[in-house]
């Protein structure tokens, strides 16, 4: 999954940003769980998810 473009994210409302952050945090939790149980994972997803969460939280702060 490719990273979202900032131009696409800027069109989101605060509620949509909150929902997307929650979704990404759940995905990050699931990845950590898979790693702990020795399942096959894609290590680069950790960085991508954290990066996208940071982008969303930055946009939320700017909109407030």
Swiss-Prot record:
Species for this entry: Acaryochloris marina (strain MBIC 11017)
Paired cysteines (S-S): none
HAMAP family named in the record: Ribosomal_uL29
The protein, known as: Large ribosomal subunit protein uL29
GO cellular component labels: cytosolic large ribosomal subunit
UniProt GO BP: translation
Pfam families xrefs: Ribosomal_L29 (PF00831)
Highest taxon, organism lineage: Bacteria
GO MF term list: structural constituent of ribosome
Keywords associated with the record: Ribonucleoprotein, Ribosomal protein
Annotated family: Belongs to the universal ribosomal protein uL29 family.
NCBIfam families xref list: L29
InterPro entries (UniProt xref): Ribosomal_protein_uL29, Ribosomal_uL29, Ribosomal_uL29_CS, Ribosomal_uL29_sf
SUPFAM superfamilies: Ribosomal protein L29 (L29p) (SSF46561)
């Amino acid at each position: 999954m490719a990273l979202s473009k900032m131009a696409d994210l800027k069109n989101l409302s605060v509620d949509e940003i909150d929902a997307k952050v929650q979704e990404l945090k759940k995905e990050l939790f699931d990845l950590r769980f898979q790693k702990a149980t020795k399942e096959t994972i894609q290590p680069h997803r950790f960085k991508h998810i954290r990066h996208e969460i940071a982008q969303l939280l930055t946009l939320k702060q700017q909109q407030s």
